[in-house]
Amino acid sequence: AGYDMWEGPYGNWGSRKYLLASLDQSLKRMGLEYVDIFYHHRPDPETPLEETMGALAQAVQSGKALYVGLSNYDGATMQQACAILKELHCPFVINQNCYSMLNRTIEQNGLLDACAEEQKGLIVFSPLAQGLLTDRYLHGIPADSRMRTDGRFLNEKQLTPERLQLLQKLQAAAQARGQKLAQLAMHWIL
């Protein structure tokens, strides 16, 4: 939870009302009684961290989630959340953050060190940078691509001439290794 679930107040971010209602809706859609991990997908600048973590703990205490995960938190905020969840005796086990050859933010924002210090797991999303680290965009933007038709997470501004040149250099490096660009990107992550 953390992104748009419905229009209007409390349809987004990290309030108790939003988190618990979105969990209930997700469980109903999936036909499940509980999820293994309930993620909060982004820190909420308007809601106190204590409220957000309290809602996650309530989800576990009610039996609707076995564990808690966080996504898109930096190191310092994750450690604050971890301290709150420890006080609430809530099992926080994993972080999920964007990481790729093109997005290395977690190396600079303290998350890697915080995960090691707190002994929390880390799983990445978008290791292919929304498809940029594939052969799809090596020669520009295809007419039928998400970049042209959607643009919410991948848009034309992200494929600058400099970025395209970098992708072509990475493609050459991948070919020198007998790989496709996507394979090189996945090996880099591992």
Residue ranges and their predicted role:
Residues L27-T47:
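Active-site groove signature of glycoside hydrolases
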Residues A1, Y34, S126:
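Short, small-residue-rich loop/turn micro-motifs
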Residues N12-M30, M78-C82:
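Short, acidic/polar
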Residues P45-L190:
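Beta/alpha (TIM)-barrel catalytic core signal, keyed to glycine-rich beta->alpha loops juxtaposed to Asp/Glu
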Residues A1-M5, Q96-Y99:
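A short, structured active-site edge motif that brings together acidic residues
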Residues Y3-L20, H41-T47:
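Active-site mouth loops of central-metabolism enzymes
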Residues K17, E33-D36, E50, A182:
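Residues in well-ordered alpha-helical elements
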Residues M5, E33, Q61:
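N-terminal binding-site loop/beta-alpha segment at the start of enzyme catalytic domains
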